[in-house]
Amino acid sequence: MAWSSLLLTLLAHCTGSWAQSVLTQPPSVSGAPGQRVTISCTGSSSNIGAGYVVHWYQQLPGTAPKLLIYGNSNRPSGVPDQFSGSKSGTSASLAITGLQSEDEADYYCKAWDNSLNA
């Protein structure tokens, strides 16, 4: 059986123009159906490393971005457990297990300073 490769395109997302803090993501990640892929999000000591929380969004073609992970590793209601998030040091990652064709999308990471909510 031939496996068609999936391509997950990624776009870097800024934490906010006032902060001028940039997060770096790879331009693309690919995997075969059923596989596990990990998408990295690299920040710095002024954002992720400073304790900012990381959120992940999925944008399917022709649709608005959907929140996948909030607060580093929490899934909103309705998001399947094939998606998981983690954070370590100045980087974060989104893991997708059991890759499916419908997972082909743009994925964004965002770092947020929770102290702004206080």
Swiss-Prot record:
Disulfide bonds: 41-109
Chain intervals for the UniProt region annotation (Framework-2): 54-70
Subcellular localization, as worded in the UniProt entry: Secreted; Cell membrane
Coiled coil: none
A matching Pfam family: V-set
Signal peptide: 1-19
Every Ig-like domain range: 20-118
Ranges for region Complementarity-determining-1: 45-53
GO biological process, one term: adaptive immune response
Positions of region (Framework-3): 74-109
Superkingdom to which the source organism belongs: Eukaryota
UniProt entry keywords in alphabetical sequence: Adaptive immunity, Cell membrane, Disulfide bond, Immunity, Immunoglobulin, Immunoglobulin domain, Membrane, Secreted, Signal
Major localization class: secreted
Protein purpose: Probable non-functional open reading frame (ORF) of V region of the variable domain of immunoglobulin light chains. Non-functional ORF generally cannot participate in the synthesis of a productive immunoglobulin chain due to altered V-(D)-J or switch recombination and/or splicing site (at mRNA level) and/or conserved amino acid change (protein level). Immunoglobulins, also known as antibodies, are membrane-bound or secreted glycoproteins produced by B lymphocytes.
Quaternary structure and interacting proteins, as annotated: Immunoglobulins are composed of two identical heavy chains and two identical light chains; disulfide-linked.
PANTHER family: IMMUNOGLOBULIN LIGHT CHAIN
Name of protein: Probable non-functional immunoglobulin lambda variable 1-50
Species of origin: Homo sapiens (Human)
